[in-house]
Amino acid sequence: MSTSRPSQSSSNSRRSRHSARMAQATVDAKIHATFEESGSSFDYSSSVRVSGTADGVNQPRSDKVTTAYLRGKMIQPFGCLLAIDEKNHMQTCKVIAYSENEPEMLTMVSHAVPSVGDHPALGIGTDIKTLFTAPSVSGLQKALGCADVSLLNPILVHCKTSGKPFYAIVHRVTGSLIVDFEPVKPYEVPMTAAGALQSYKLAAKAITRLQSLPSGNMERLCDTMVQEVFELTGYDRVMAYKFHEDDHGEVIREITKPCLEPYLGLHYPATDIPQASRFLFRKNKVRMIVDCHAKHVRVLQDEKLQFDLILCGSTLRAPHSCHAQYMANMDSIASLVLAVVVNDNEEDGDTDAVQPQKTERLWGLVVCHNTTPRFVPFPLRYAREFLPQVFADHVHKEIELEYQIIEKNILHHPGHLLCMLMRDAPLGIASESPNIMDLVKCDGAALIYRNKVWRLGVTPSEPQIREIALWLSEYHMDSTSFSTDSLFDAGFPSALSLGDVVCGMASVRVTAKDMVFWFRSHTAAEIRWGGAKHEAGEKDDSRRMHPRSSFKAFLEVVKARSLPWKEYEMDAIHSLQIILRNAFKEDTESLDLNAKAINTRLRDLKIEGINDLKIERMQELEAVTSEIVRLDYTATVPILAVDVDGLVNGWNIKIAELTGLPIGEATGKHLLTLVEDSSTDRVKKMLNLALLGEEEKNVQFEIKTLGSKMDSGPISLVVNRCASRDLRDNVVGVCFVAHDITAQKNVMDKFIRIEGDYKAIVQNRNPLIPPIFGTDEFGWCCEWNPAMMKLTGWKREEVMDKMLLGEIFGTQMAACRLKNQEAFVNLGVVLNKAMTGSETEKVPFGFFARNGKYVECLLSVSKKLDVEGLVTGVFCFLQLASPELQQALHIQRLSEQTASKRLNALSYMKRQIRNPLCGIVFSRKMLEGTDLGTEQKQLLRTSAQCQQQLSKILDDSDLDTIIDGYLDLEMAEFTLHEVLVTSLSQVMEKSNGKSIRIVNDVAGHIMMETLYGDSLRLQQVLADFLLISINFTPNGGQVVVAGSLTKEQLGKSVHLVKLELSITHGGSGVPEVLLNQMFGNNGLESEEGISLLIRAKLLKLMNGDVRYLREAGKSAFILSAELAAAHNLKA
């Protein structure tokens, strides 16, 4: 699959991958049909090579080929199958299809000489209720009555004639219900309970171990998963597969019994696991093949049916013949495959959305192989299905962590770029370190600048690079950037002459003739198989389907392809492109030692200005801190704080009321002396973590009551804690914001103490009773109190005796829909931990109520015991935030959404402005090449200065950097004349519209003085203050610009220039509100106020200031800045 696209959004990329997979599915079908026709003459390697070019010529001959590939009518012989007519299945359970071995397995008795009537006839139209005992029929009908019939799998049934036990596994397909029957082996203890709660217990140890692993180590996670599955299943080999972006697979982890050939590191083509199989893995996450040599059993269906039965969801579905042969060739007779399905998109979306569904993708597989036939009972397989779900959740978290690391690395790109360009720009990007090869992962890079070529690392020759540049200019002139993982697939004529050295390339065009290239070698060069090596003289048969052939075929496919270019890598490349466009405009002469002295002096002055600014900000922070302290003191929730030694230094009115301890007495006491003994260890651990900077939420502890409150007992608090830090980011204390749950805890404690009379409490409509629901030991809902009814909108009679996992809380057709599959798995883990007797902590929980509103709360689960101490179910308690807190959170979400929308709108506008701006720059450059007069050239220079100022403003994405004084100024030579003329040009349209006369009173020698500093920022400041002055000048008035310049000698030949400009205007002047905003004295800034504040901060960065003077009938802005006299630098 070629990826030679100039640029592509992530959504387009996803659509492209989807289209490629759809095309690959039809190719898979053709390969399968070819295999069936070829038999023993099938050539595996050539089929894989052909599949690599999935074009119109290689499409299957008809849709029937694809249909035959997807619709098989064979099952494995270890079980049997029935299909029931879905229309009246609750009354008649009429058979419309059955497997040929069904009569033998279900109706034959065990004695040698059968009697008449021993077994009922089985055929089309048979009522299956005649085949099983009454309790079995009752269980089947109960399952068939569920909206999701698979929730109760497996269902234990007994044959009426033989009494043999079977597991019935039910699923729904179009027009029918498919029931797979798997025999219960003599050595098994039959599982009489249905659903996930019982199956979980079989994998509890492995799940607990997975959940205990620390984050940030994908290799350890995969190792643990493979080890646990190996121990749990007993198979000879367990491998973890990972699917890459191009859908090829890799064995990333493996564990085997001795004497088996290892496959670790094996890469295999995408065709080895067809797209149709991958789709089925997403639907049915466990797949078992008991014996690949076993003869398959046909399924017979009613000839009157208008449709073909689809057996894709059957646990008994027979493997395709090509897969069975592949298994046999690698000496694998039995297999068990567990699918690892993760969320495809990265963002959860709005929690209030009505349908916040995530798309899923198949991340990989955990594959078990055995050298002899092996059967795993369904309950054990179901438990193994739960295990990869937990594993998939952890994989998803690791993927998100990897994305965060990538984003963090992206933040380092500007630093790399600046380091490259600070020395000998622009040639420093190729001749210094770091250079362009350090920007992204590559094998080589090249720069074409002024018709010369600089090469780094492994690259094509200089003539070949020039040929590539010419090809890009001819065929990709419309794009300024280009990337591909295969120059051959992209259409480069001389790609074959490059050999294996260069396959992939990314490039950017800086100017019409200057370009930067990055090169990558073929993927196969970076791939090593850790499997067994050949013995002397041993050779592979490439026609034979085998892992060695798969690896060889994969190398054949990727030998002319490199690793794909990631989006974040192209972002870094584009960033360099933007910076180089400015750097390539002209080569600036290097400055002498005097320039370095000026830079040093200016940096010192800048630091002094920053320190002054910090003092000013500290004063502002002190005022803000005082206000926060006042708010905390009067808050309606308990708030307390301690210093690094654990001594209380914050104790608000609410906590004083609850504990009976006045503020003066609490201050200075150690927090551990104020909490209950039972909470000491928990609070001590919490303090230690907080002092290390680790924040924690929803921590519960009890605090003592004193004085008048002593007899009321301890106060139960749930706190969110955060570390308090000083200006140097050192932790100086801990702040606790608490929620009083004493009333709820007293109710819960009373409930636990008086369990025999729990109904009087649970069903009480007192508002202090929290929402409570419960299940029995089999997962059926057995409790749903009034508070739960009010919260969810579902009545008690609507949920009782339904499966809690799936029917009540689930992701599809459940009453209370969960946000995603991860939430469903986490709920199952919490319930099952309590069911197995393990201690559980409060966990965040959320679901959509009947009215579509998303409910967020904390879930606490307690086991329910009978008189003998056996677990008979669980009780679940929900803790909701107070209405005030919910309102605050709602307002916060609305504010975040509004800010996000504004940020998106701003990003869109900035992005849309850049393209027209590039067009304006291009038009100006074209005009510069024409025959222009002096006045016209001056207008072009003014236009260029305005364009550069606009580009600079568009790059200002973080205003806090400017406000806090951390913006880097770009120093260059300029004259005040250039700056003033450009600034005046930006306000002339406005002044002409108001008939305002602008007078330039700056002396000529000052105007022509050559200065050294950031001219664009000075121009930006001056233009804004001119605009504000004109806005508040009456029509027909006058604005006068005057200036003065003084020099202070630094050393023998360097002069520091103190520039002062005044902008005087008539009228009543600028309102005080705006001036207060300019000086940062008002937090509610208008657009004009923000503009003035930013310009004042820019002057601060230039060691300057702004003042505003009022006189009778006129007012003036006085602007000052410190620069350097540039003409003295060359002396």
From Swiss-Prot:
Residues 1-13 have a biased composition (Low complexity). Keywords: Chromophore, Photoreceptor protein, Phytochrome signaling pathway, Receptor, Repeat, Sensory transduction, Transcription, Transcription regulation. One of its GO terms (biological process) is regulation of DNA-templated transcription. Residues 217-399 form the GAF domain. Residues 1-27 are annotated as: Disordered. The keyword Transcription applies. One of its GO terms (molecular function) is phosphorelay sensor kinase activity. Residues 908-1127 form the Histidine kinase domain. Signal peptide: none annotated. Phytochromobilin binds at residue 322. InterPro entries: GAF (IPR003018), GAF-like_dom_sf (IPR029016), HATPase_C_sf (IPR036890), His_kinase_dom (IPR005467), HisK_dim/P_dom (IPR003661), PAS (IPR000014), PAS-like_dom_sf (IPR035965), PAS_2 (IPR013654). Coiled coil: none annotated. Contains one covalently linked phytochromobilin chromophore. Residues 624-694, 757-831 form the PAS domain. Pfam families: GAF, HATPase_c, HisKA, PAS, PAS_2, PHY. Belongs to the phytochrome family. Homodimer. NCBIfam families: sensory_box. This is Phytochrome A. It comes from Glycine max (Soybean). The gene is PHYA.
